[in-house]
Design a protein with these regions (language model features):
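Short, surface-exposed coil-to-beta transition loops
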Residues: 3-5, 59-63, 85-88
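Hydrophobic ligand-binding cavity/cleft-lining segments
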Residues: 1-44, 144
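A short, structured loop/turn motif at beta-sheet edges
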Residues: 14, 41-45, 67-71, 91-101
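Short, highly charged C-terminal tails/helix-capping segments
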Residues: 136-144
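Generic structural detector for well-ordered beta-strands
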Residues: 7-11, 38, 52, 65-67, ...
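Hydrophobic pocket/interface hotspot
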Residues: 17, 21, 27, 49, ...
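Glycine-rich portal/gate segments that line the openings of hydrophobic small-molecule binding cavities
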Residues: 38-79, 133, 137
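Beta-strand/loop substructures that line and gate deep hydrophobic ligand-binding cavities in soluble
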Residues: 78-129
């Protein structure tokens, strides 16, 4: 099982960062390796989203069910994809009116096989830089 824990302190509100991370369809604009993203269903408390990843000739897609607690947490659970196990969460901790700690925690493992090994390398590269990508996107949208 692979675990990823990343965080950043940003001069933006928890609301701004929640909205940015929850804008799944914008991911291909700023997330390295994400070539497609779509919201399949949303009702305000939950979102079903699909991400298409591609890098180095390897492509994989997966779908998550996201539980939304506005401006606090987005919990991710796997609906469909190459994983044996997958769970995670984005957390938004307000530190002041215009300061927030954003955190990403992911735990995942892939099904066996050669394709899974390639998918694991792709996913490791993409997820390892997610928080950095969100930081850059926030600076682009909200200023520095």
């Amino acid at each position: 099982m692979t675990s990823i824990h990343r965080s950043a302190l940003l001069p933006f509100s928890d609301r701004q960062l929640f909205v940015l991370v929850n804008d799944v369809e914008a991911y291909p604009q700023f997330m390295d390796g994400c070539v497609g993203a779509s919201v399949l269903h949303t009702d305000g408390e939950h979102m079903e989203a699909r991400l298409d990843l591609s890098r180095g000739g390897i492509s994989q897609s997966f779908t998550t069910c996201n539980e939304l607690v506005p401006y606090e947490i987005i919990r991710l659970t796997l609906k469909d994809g190459p994983f044996e196990q997958f769970a995670g969460a984005w957390r938004f901790q307000a530190l002041a009116e215009q300061a927030c700690k954003v955190s990403l925690d992911l735990e995942f493992s892939f099904r066996g096989g050669l394709l899974s090994a390639a998918a694991a390398r792709l996913f490791d590269r993409v997820t390892g830089n997610l928080v950095d990508a969100v930081v850059r996107r926030a600076q682009d949208i909200y200023g520095t």
